[in-house]
From Swiss-Prot:
Molecular functions (GO terms): 16S rRNA (adenine(1518)-N(6)/adenine(1519)-N(6))-dimethyltransferase activity; RNA binding
Annotated binding of S-adenosyl-L-methionine, by residue: 15, 17, 42, 64, 89, 108
Protein's recorded name: Ribosomal RNA small subunit methyltransferase A
Stated role: Specifically dimethylates two adjacent adenosines (A1518 and A1519) in the loop of a conserved hairpin near the 3'-end of 16S rRNA in the 30S particle. May play a critical role in biogenesis of 30S subunits.
This protein's encoding gene: rsmA
Length: 274
């Protein structure tokens, strides 16, 4: 198939990056080397794929959902030994055979699957992470990145920002206007780099699970004070004890609690409940 004859499908949320400066920027921040095994999600017509393959990398494995693009991509890159292609849905495809080989993940994420993609590649609290990614580069919806980077006290702060910041170091590289895509989306995007935190000595899986439990309970009623949300799992006596031992005011709302305070709350809550 000739790429000029291909028409994008709305159901796949296809907005292809055409801004050459941003394509080059992605390659630049990836800091590629001869040992890199790249996973590219949704290569589209291969604009970014081509740039990545022209770098000193070991392998690029691309996963594309749209069957009509498979032949186009194979025709374009079939003679490149570093390239492999798999047709499938990234939300359900089995990556076990290559997961431990992948060093970097790069994707222009369809807005409608941002949450599940973050769960798969950044991870979830309390779930053992079965990967060794050095760097994850996502082009994603700007307002989601705004939420992810929010600190305590911000109206955007929430369970998502705390989870993502506990699991990775995050850096926004730049914002990307709709005109950088074809067709243009209705909103701005942001180019962001996640570096998974592999060995956070403060946390273990059981503590992560408890932090996640506290976050779910608290942010389900984010307008309420902690005292009035955690009373579903703690008695008034336990709440007072936890407030004192953690040095956290329970008259605050969850978005006003720092990450270190959530860790301390979970640690002391576990002690109280033993």
């Amino acid at each position: 198939m000739n790429s000029k004859n291909y028409h994008q499908k709305k159901r796949f949320g296809q907005h292809w990056l055409v801004n050459k400066k941003i394509l080059e920027k992605i390659k630049e921040i990836a800091v590629l080397n001869e040992n890199d095994f790249i996973l590219e999600i949704g290569p589209g017509k291969g604009a970014l794929t081509s740039k990545l393959l022209n770098s000193e990398i070991k392998k690029l494995h691309a996963i594309e959902l749209d069957k009509d693009l498979i032949n186009l991509l194979n025709d374009k890159f079939n003679n490149n030994d570093k390239f492999s292609l798999q047709q499938g849905d990234i939300l359900s495809v089995n990556l076990d055979s290559i997961n431990k080989k992948i060093t970097k993940v790069i994707a222009n994420i369809p807005y409608n699957i941002t949450g599940p993609i973050l769960d798969i590649f950044i991870g979830r609290l309390g779930i053992i992470r079965k990967y060794n990614y050095e760097k994850i580069i996502f082009l994603m919806q700007k307002d989601v990145v705004d939420r992810i980077l929010s600190k305590e006290g911000s109206p955007n702060a929430g369970a998502l920002s705390i989870r993502m910041q506990l699991l990775s170091k995050i850096k926004r590289i730049c914002d990307v206007p709709p005109s950088s895509f074809s067709p243009p989306p209705k909103v701005f995007s942001s180019l962001v780099v996640f570096e998974p935190i592999k060995n956070d000595l403060r946390l273990d899986i059981s503590l992560e699970k408890y932090i996640d439990k506290l976050l779910r309970i608290s942010f389900n009623s984010r307008r309420k004070m902690l005292r009035n949300t955690l009373n579903t799992i703690l008695s008034n006596e336990e709440i007072n004890e936890l407030s004192e031992s953690s040095k956290v005011c329970f008259n605050l709302r969850p978005q006003d609690i720092s990450i270190d305070q959530w860790i301390k709350l979970a640690e002391n809550c576990i002690k109280i409940k033993k």
